[in-house]
Amino acid sequence: KHFDNMARATSLKTLEIAMRMDDIEDLPFPVGTVLTRDEIEELHRYNLHDVIATIYFYVRCIPEIEFREVLTKRYDRNFMNHNDTKIGKDYLIMKLEESGVKCFIKTPTGRIPRQTLRPSIKLGDVIFPYVKLEHPEFRRIHETLAAKTITETKGSIKDLTCIVDGLSYKFGTGGLHASDDCKIFKADDEYAIEMRDVTSYYPSMAIVNNLRPLHLGDQFPLIYGDMFKQRRSYPKGTPENAMLKLALNGTYGDSNNIYSPFYDPFFCMQITLNGQLLLCMLVEQLIKTPNLRMININTDGVGFIYPRKYRSHVDAVCGWWEKLTLLGLETEEYSLFAQRDCNNYIGVEV
């Protein structure tokens, strides 16, 4: 939808499939064919179909185009060809620099981003002191991580897994993942299916724990936290809400980007490791509920099926976790939950 896009070479036919068009056609004649009059008419019809598909794609892009037009006019800078991540990053940089936080160093050849380089990171220094785990397998993961020193973040916690109540939990820099694969779960009068997702997990964790890339100083969490509050004041669907969401969510990803002014791998590991371990703390308390079964854990939330008569207990456990972490949990209830794996599922909301 914009030129700064890994998929910009995607063919029109692939777009037609993605847009679920009823009729997808290929060129009706080999390239270079000398056409008859009837074949020319057929080619005109084929070309018209492609024009309609192109217009359809344009219409699908109008909200994003208008979003960028509003931002370009409002902030007097060209956002038209920015991808979503770059929109958020540039907005946060703009706000930091307005507050006197330098994000770049000027040199005779241009500017270079300010960064915090880390020759090595002791993961024991990264983990929050209030992370306490009870289940032997989760404790093993905690102890393994705490004893580890890394020199780069990529692949640093690859292939780290444990099995709890028959479910395999996979840890990594991309977050915690687990799922009861290739299953269909149905709620009824006795059992409920719920997802408890952490509200804006990574941004919220950075804010409540006062985390920041070291080189950006004490102003960063103040500005970041203020942006979080501002976003909640704008209705969903407004350009302001979308802009602030992109700015908040893009910071974590850029904290591990060597070309970014947010680069600080210690900050990156603080968020991803604690994010996973805090979810484990929630899981190990929830599974104490009789007949509660975890079915899906994916980076920022947990899904489970459990007897409805224990709802007050489940709510109390979630309330305890919220009070401990200062993070919020949102609840979605499903009548049916069918999944291939933790990233591919269909949920029918109640």
Please report, for each region that a protein language model flagged, where it lies by residue.
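Activity-critical C-terminal alpha-helical subdomain
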Residues: 1-5
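Helical catalytic core of nucleic-acid polymerases
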Residues: 6-9, 27-34, 155-284, 288-289, ...
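Conserved "right-hand" nucleotidyltransferase catalytic core of DNA-directed polymerases
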Residues: 7-11, 15-26, 32-199, 285-322, ...
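Short, low-order "capping/linker" segments at domain edges
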Residues: 343-350
